[in-house]
């Protein structure tokens, strides 16, 4: 067993399938943690996850999150202090509505398995196009 520690990296590690910047934090056998950031005025792509579920905690910015699973669909306001769940198979999309980036920490259970986990779905809003 080891004890891990890591600071939030200054540079992104990857771009998520939804288009947000990802900074990978820590990983254990049962889950992983990452920081997601979406620039002001941007709208993510809409995706769903095949096998993982997530818990998000919003740290900065303000925006909206669309979630749809089977016959339930909602749009919620997200801002610092808001925590929400994204069960496996849930379609979701988010957008940054403020003047600062929308930033959240997400716990993924089980750990993110890699390419192919997220798949594109039809979203609530048009995705913002930009060079990455």
Residue locations for each model-derived region?
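Short acidic-glycine-tyrosine-enriched beta hairpin
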Residues: 70-88
């Amino acid at each position: 067993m080891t004890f891990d520690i890591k600071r939030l990296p200054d540079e992104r590690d990857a771009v998520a399938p939804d288009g947000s910047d990802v900074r990978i934090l820590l990983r254990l056998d049962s889950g992983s943690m990452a920081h997601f950031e979406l620039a002001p005025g941007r709208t993510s792509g809409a995706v769903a996850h095949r096998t993982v579920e997530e818990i998000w905690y919003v740290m900065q910015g303000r925006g909206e999150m669309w979630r749809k699973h089977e016959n339930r669909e909602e749009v919620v306001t997200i801002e610092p202090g808001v925590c929400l769940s994204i069960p496996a198979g849930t379609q979701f999309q988010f957008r940054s509505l403020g003047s600062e980036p929308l930033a959240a920490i997400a716990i993924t259970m089980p750990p993110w398995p890699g390419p192919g986990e997220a798949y594109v779905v039809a979203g609530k809003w048009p995705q913002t196009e930009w060079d990455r």
